[in-house]
């Protein structure tokens, strides 16, 4: 009698990982503690995911939940705040009430012992003083990380079971602040207790990168500088800061997206084959390739900031970044960045890795585009286009390979077409869990494969800290671009200068995400 839980466990780990430290203790009580339970992340992401796990019987049977925040709330008020995001069907109402009956809430400060002592008393009461495992999710601003983690360590740790701490980015602002945070956490917890969450590592196609690379001879044998001309990793959003202007203006697009999400994807694309699928073997290879990346310089970057479109049909479309009331009028914070990274190793020497991200662009899209070299000895009068392997992360997961074929008919014309694996078509009846679902389940199972280790962080900040400090020190003005555009034209020129060819002649037809825009 296989339950959904059995199936998810099989998908999360190999059988050998039980003896390598990855466990799913189905019969032991688990308590999931949400710090910042009154915040947006909790109501929009964390509580909905926990409800879906409970609904689908994916959690250990003796799991309970406890929220903690400064706000004077009750479980009923949190339940009301979360309702729009919970997706409860009418026939699930009974089970939904059962889920909330397993919840408690404690109000307290983050900078004192009293609230945490009350929290620990509540946890012991919920666990009936039995052996229990505890997961602490810090959905909190970084300003309170240190106080909260000290109080967790001193007051709230399970004595008999294991303890795991989930931490949200940002993991510092630069190499010094990130290292200070890592040193602080290392003094309190073992690395195997820390789960630094980068939700992009939980996305279906990002997790598929290893299989695509190392499970297919046709790709693995061409995955090198002899065959690949350039790699373009893109993250585009059609919307702006949406109420996060204050936070975003402090951190900017490089810290918010490029230094973490895009660099993590790059490490999966560029790393060497690990000796096994054990989490630490994979993370070891990620660190090795990050160590081979040269520090980013200003000559390899384009920075942009969006303007409102005077012809926009809504107030939002007509509003530029600095017109956001939460943003300084003279802000130099980039909302668009393109950076060219160079990997100094045998496999990738001379292949540009172009990272591109921006807000208020022409579409929502995240993808990896592997562009192959031109065909040598062209016999088709220059009509061939480069082959491309495109891994679409969102929206609409897909994998397609652009190639040249003869056009149907009596002529001998050639055209671009694709070998297409669009998940929407190939896996019609499959449910693709979202990133937070996968990653929270990984924490229950103890799999750190898709979480960021401290040495990965150190190398990531080494690459980006000098350019971030230079931008701030020299008050470098970003190039302006209009709402709804593809971004600064200078970015297209830099792509071209770095051996990425874009003809604009091809339109992918694979599903709803079809577009001719790069």
Swiss-Prot record:
Q: According to its UniProt record, which residues of this chain constitute the active site? A: 261
* Gene3D superfamilies associated with the record: Dihydrodipicolinate Reductase, domain 2, NAD(P)-binding Rossmann-like Domain
Q: Which HAMAP family match?
A: G6PD
The UniProt entry's sequence similarity note says: Belongs to the glucose-6-phosphate dehydrogenase family.
Task: Tell me a GO cellular component.
Answer: cytosol
Q: What is this protein called?
A: Glucose-6-phosphate 1-dehydrogenase
Q: State the species of origin.
A: Drosophila yakuba
GO BP: glucose 6-phosphate metabolic process; glucose metabolic process; NADP metabolic process; pentose-phosphate shunt, oxidative branch
Sequence positions that bind NADP(+) 2: 356, 365, 369, 392, 400-402, 420-422, 486, 502, 508
């Amino acid at each position: 009698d296989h339950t959904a839980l059995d199936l998810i466990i099989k998908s999360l780990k190999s059988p050998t990982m039980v003896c390598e430290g990855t466990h799913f203790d189905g019969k032991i009580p688990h308590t999931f503690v949400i710090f910042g339970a009154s915040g947006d992340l909790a109501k929009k992401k964390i509580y909905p995911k926990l409800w879906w796990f409970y609904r689908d019987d994916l959690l250990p049977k003796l799991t309970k939940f406890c929220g903690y925040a400064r706000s004077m709330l009750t479980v009923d008020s949190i339940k009301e705040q979360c309702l729009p995001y919970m997706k409860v069907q009418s026939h699930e109402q009974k089970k939904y009430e059962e889920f909330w009956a397993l919840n408690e809430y404690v109000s307290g400060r983050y900078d004192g012992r009293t609230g945490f002592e009350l929290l620990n008393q509540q946890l012991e009461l919920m666990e009936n003083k039995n052996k229990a495992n505890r997961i602490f999710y810090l959905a909190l601003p970084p300003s309170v990380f240190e106080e909260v983690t000290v109080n967790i360590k001193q007051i709230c740790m399970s004595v008999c079971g294991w303890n795991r701490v989930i931490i949200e980015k940002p993991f510092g602002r630069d190499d010094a602040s990130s290292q200070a945070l890592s040193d602080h956490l290392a003094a309190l917890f073992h690395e195997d207790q820390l789960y630094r969450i980068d939700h992009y590592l939980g996305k279906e196609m990002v997790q598929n990168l290893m299989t695509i690379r190392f499970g297919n001879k046709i790709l693995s044998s061409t995955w090198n500088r002899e065959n690949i001309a350039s790699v373009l990793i893109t993250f585009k959003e059609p919307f702006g800061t949406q109420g996060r202007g204050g936070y975003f203006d402090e951190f900017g697009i490089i810290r918010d997206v490029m230094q973490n999400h895009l660099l993590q994807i790059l490490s999966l694309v560029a790393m060497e084959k690990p000796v096994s699928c054990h989490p630490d073997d994979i993370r070891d290879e990620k660190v090795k390739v990050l160590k081979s990346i040269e520090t980013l310089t200003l000559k390899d970057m384009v920075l942009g900031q969006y303007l409102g479109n005077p012809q926009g049909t809504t107030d939002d479309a007509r509003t530029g970044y600095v017109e956001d009331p939460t943003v300084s009028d003279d802000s130099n914070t980039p909302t668009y960045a393109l950076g060219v990274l160079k990997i100094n190793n045998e496999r990738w020497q001379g292949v540009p890795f172009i990272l591109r991200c921006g807000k208020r662009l022409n579409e929502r899209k995240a993808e990896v585009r592997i562009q192959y070299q031109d065909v040598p000895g062209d016999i088709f009068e220059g009509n061939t286009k480069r082959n491309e392997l495109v891994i679409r992360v969102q929206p609409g997961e897909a994998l397609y390979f652009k190639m040249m074929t003869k056009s149907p008919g009596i002529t001998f014309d050639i055209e671009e077409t694709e070998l297409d694996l669009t998940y929407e078509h190939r896996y019609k009846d499959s449910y693709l869990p979202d990133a937070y679902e996968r990653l929270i389940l990984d924490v229950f199972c103890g799999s750190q494969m898709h979480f960021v280790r401290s040495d990965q962080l150190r190398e990531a900040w080494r690459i980006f800290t000098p350019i971030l400090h230079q931008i701030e020190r020299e008050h470098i003005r970003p190039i302006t671009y209009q709402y709804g555009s593809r971004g600064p034209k200078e970015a297209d020129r830099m792509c071209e200068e770095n051996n990425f060819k874009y003809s604009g002649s091809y339109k992918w037809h694979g599903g709803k995400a079809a577009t001719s825009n790069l």
